[in-house]
């Protein structure tokens, strides 16, 4: 036990970049806690801190898959990730140096967040994916590098791996929102990087390249994603190409029946189409048709004042 504590102390004393990251995460967390119960707080506020929502990431705010790692909202999430960063980050930084540690974190954050976004419609927030990458790296290195050998590696592996299905269970039945895909992809990346300079170097480099390639492509093309379809639907909607926009909104609803973006914007398109028909029929004196179209609009939007007022004007 004394040896373990001495090792932790040495890691912390020699760590530099780890403490910079921790201080930045703490600053963001404190600012969010200060603002979250005020009228100033919104999704836009989180974007300013570095965590744009999925829709915004697909709208060219690609930096969000990296900067979101520094953002924490809940106390439990922040405390766990802060402890993980201190212990795992300082351990790795001491052994590979600041430059390699920075590059490792950049790759881990990019891939873990991109995979989480691509397969869940939410990039998530926090350092969980990066911490799992650090653990995956350390655990794999224990078998090939004497500097990384730790006595409790098997116990730690069991705990870390069992935590993933536990979080998934709590996501479904306990109201949690843990980015489990980020944990899995982070652990995988860490394990791959550990073998980067081994006899499997070429295979590892190819694997990492493919993971990064998928991460990049997924930001501009994920047709199975409801949020991606919504982002494209709004893009074409704003360009007045309603047919193309409608196809994207329908796809969004296909992949997520509860998609507010898809359902609400389809209603807007339908109301616009009915409004144009009602306007034409009213001006031509075809009042029966006009009444029908006004009533159809009110079935979709019962508070539509334009349809209500024009109904009153009908003879």
Identify what each model region corresponds to.
Residues 2-234:
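A detector for small-residue-rich transmembrane helices and their helix-helix packing motifs
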Residues 223-237, 268-282, 309:
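Alpha-helical tetratricopeptide repeat
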Residues 232, 258-259, 304:
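Residue-level recognition of tetratricopeptide repeat
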Residues 261-262, 307:
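TPR alpha-solenoid repeat register
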